Amino acid sequence: MKVTPLGERLLIKPLKEEKKTEGGIVLPDSAKEKPMKAEVVAVGEKVENIDVKVGDRVIFSKYAGTEIKIDDVDYIIIDANDILAKIEE
Protein backbone atom coordinates (compact mmCIF):
# COMPACT_ATOMS: atom_id res chain seq x y z
CA MET A 1 0.00 0.00 0.00
CA LYS A 2 1.33 3.46 -0.89
CA VAL A 3 0.48 6.44 1.31
CA THR A 4 1.11 9.98 0.06
CA PRO A 5 0.80 12.74 2.67
CA LEU A 6 -1.25 15.74 1.56
CA GLY A 7 -0.29 19.40 1.81
CA GLU A 8 2.49 20.30 4.24
CA ARG A 9 2.67 16.87 5.88
CA LEU A 10 5.24 14.10 5.95
CA LEU A 11 4.99 10.36 6.51
CA ILE A 12 7.70 9.24 8.93
CA LYS A 13 8.70 5.88 10.40
CA PRO A 14 9.79 6.06 14.06
CA LEU A 15 13.24 4.62 14.68
CA LYS A 16 13.26 1.79 17.21
CA GLU A 17 15.73 2.15 20.05
CA GLU A 18 16.27 -0.70 22.47
CA LYS A 19 16.23 0.70 25.98
CA LYS A 20 18.14 -0.93 28.81
CA THR A 21 18.43 0.01 32.44
CA GLU A 22 21.85 0.52 34.01
CA GLY A 23 21.56 -3.05 35.31
CA GLY A 24 21.12 -4.38 31.75
CA ILE A 25 17.36 -5.08 31.87
CA VAL A 26 15.67 -4.52 28.49
CA LEU A 27 12.53 -2.42 28.94
CA PRO A 28 9.28 -3.46 27.21
CA ASP A 29 7.66 -1.03 24.74
CA SER A 30 5.04 -0.04 27.32
CA ALA A 31 7.75 1.32 29.65
CA LYS A 32 9.66 3.30 27.03
CA GLU A 33 9.25 6.96 26.23
CA LYS A 34 7.71 7.84 22.89
CA PRO A 35 10.44 7.97 20.20
CA MET A 36 11.36 11.37 18.79
CA LYS A 37 13.61 10.20 15.94
CA ALA A 38 12.28 8.96 12.62
CA GLU A 39 13.08 8.30 8.99
CA VAL A 40 11.20 10.28 6.34
CA VAL A 41 9.18 7.90 4.13
CA ALA A 42 7.17 10.39 2.02
CA VAL A 43 6.90 14.17 1.69
CA GLY A 44 3.73 16.10 0.82
CA GLU A 45 3.73 18.23 -2.33
CA LYS A 46 3.47 21.54 -0.43
CA VAL A 47 6.38 21.01 2.00
CA GLU A 48 8.63 23.96 1.18
CA ASN A 49 9.97 25.53 4.37
CA ILE A 50 12.23 22.65 5.45
CA ASP A 51 14.99 20.82 3.61
CA VAL A 52 14.05 17.15 4.05
CA LYS A 53 13.67 14.34 1.56
CA VAL A 54 12.79 10.66 1.62
CA GLY A 55 15.42 8.72 3.56
CA ASP A 56 16.46 11.60 5.84
CA ARG A 57 16.48 11.02 9.59
CA VAL A 58 14.78 13.70 11.66
CA ILE A 59 13.91 14.71 15.21
CA PHE A 60 10.27 15.67 15.73
CA SER A 61 8.06 17.07 18.50
CA LYS A 62 7.27 14.43 21.11
CA TYR A 63 3.47 14.33 20.80
CA ALA A 64 3.09 15.55 17.22
CA GLY A 65 1.28 13.82 14.40
CA THR A 66 -1.17 10.99 13.94
CA GLU A 67 0.02 7.43 14.44
CA ILE A 68 -1.06 4.90 11.80
CA LYS A 69 -0.25 1.28 11.02
CA ILE A 70 0.24 0.07 7.44
CA ASP A 71 0.98 -3.60 6.76
CA ASP A 72 1.87 -4.07 10.46
CA VAL A 73 4.43 -1.23 10.37
CA ASP A 74 4.01 1.88 12.55
CA TYR A 75 4.14 5.30 10.89
CA ILE A 76 3.29 8.88 11.84
CA ILE A 77 1.72 11.51 9.59
CA ILE A 78 3.18 14.78 10.82
CA ASP A 79 2.96 18.46 9.96
CA ALA A 80 6.20 19.84 8.48
CA ASN A 81 6.35 22.46 11.28
CA ASP A 82 6.73 19.66 13.85
CA ILE A 83 10.07 18.57 12.37
CA LEU A 84 12.68 20.11 14.67
CA ALA A 85 15.99 19.00 13.14
CA LYS A 86 17.64 16.79 10.55
CA ILE A 87 20.13 14.17 11.78
CA GLU A 88 23.31 14.00 9.74
CA GLU A 89 25.88 11.29 10.41
Swiss-Prot record:
Q: Which InterPro entries match?
A: Chaperonin_GroES, Chaperonin_GroES_sf, Chaprnonin_Cpn10_CS, GroES-like_sf
Annotated compartments: Cytoplasm
- Point out the coiled-coil segments of this chain: none
- UniProt KW Cytoplasm keyword: yes
Q: What is its main location?
A: cytoplasm
Keywords, A to Z, come to:
Chaperone, Cytoplasm
- Establish whether keyword ATP-binding is in the entry: no
Source taxon at top rank: Bacteria
Q: Which CDD domains match?
A: cpn10
Q: GO biological process: what's one of them?
A: chaperone cofactor-dependent protein refolding
Gene Ontology CC? cytoplasm
Subunit arrangement?
Heptamer of 7 subunits arranged in a ring. Interacts with the chaperonin GroEL.
List the PANTHER family. Answer: 10 KDA HEAT SHOCK PROTEIN, 20 KDA CHAPERONIN, CHLOROPLASTIC
Tell me which family the UniProt entry assigns to this protein: Belongs to the GroES chaperonin family.
Q: What is this protein called?
A: Co-chaperonin GroES
Name the species this protein comes from.
Pseudothermotoga lettingae (strain ATCC BAA-301 / DSM 14385 / NBRC 107922 / TMO) (Thermotoga lettingae)
